[in-house]
Amino acid sequence: MKILVLESSGNKHGSSNLLAEAFVRGAEEKGHEVTEFDVFRADIRPCIGCNRCGMNGPCVQKDDYETKLKGLIKETDMLVFVMPVYYYNWPAQLKTVIDRFYSFTTELTYMHKKAALLTVAWDDTDIVFTVVEAYYHRICEYMQFEDMGMVLGGGCCTPEMT
């Protein structure tokens, strides 16, 4: 299986990237082909809502999403979203990637991809992952992704760890 790991932490050595490294190592040991993409450091601009793509065409923005990431998404069997939780939600960089799914929503929904979520948070209260989980499940449902599971790591306690 081809797996695309979307990493979105600004901290290259933080807990979310440690989770990503462990996932990649395990997947490769099982014979899967894994590609990692650093969403945080890529030039990915937000959707401008111009609707020129019509949910099926190329995006008018010629950034790393349109020229690199979109092709990787199309080629993969599974997307793995890796992120620290920021204020009880998804980081802007990863949310921007999902917003840009709009440019090929129809095509992407018929690809029936698999998805997983690996996330960490400073906080370890009962509510820290509520919004994150709800959004992930909604995206899986809407995009017809098969939910392969989540790893939710709370209580990381320092910015260096997330």
Question: What are the roles of these predicted feature ranges?
Answer:
Residues A42-D43, D123, C156-C157:
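Short, internal active-site loops enriched in acidic
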Residues A92-Q93, T106-G149:
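Short, glycine-/small-residue-rich phosphate/pyrophosphate-handling segment
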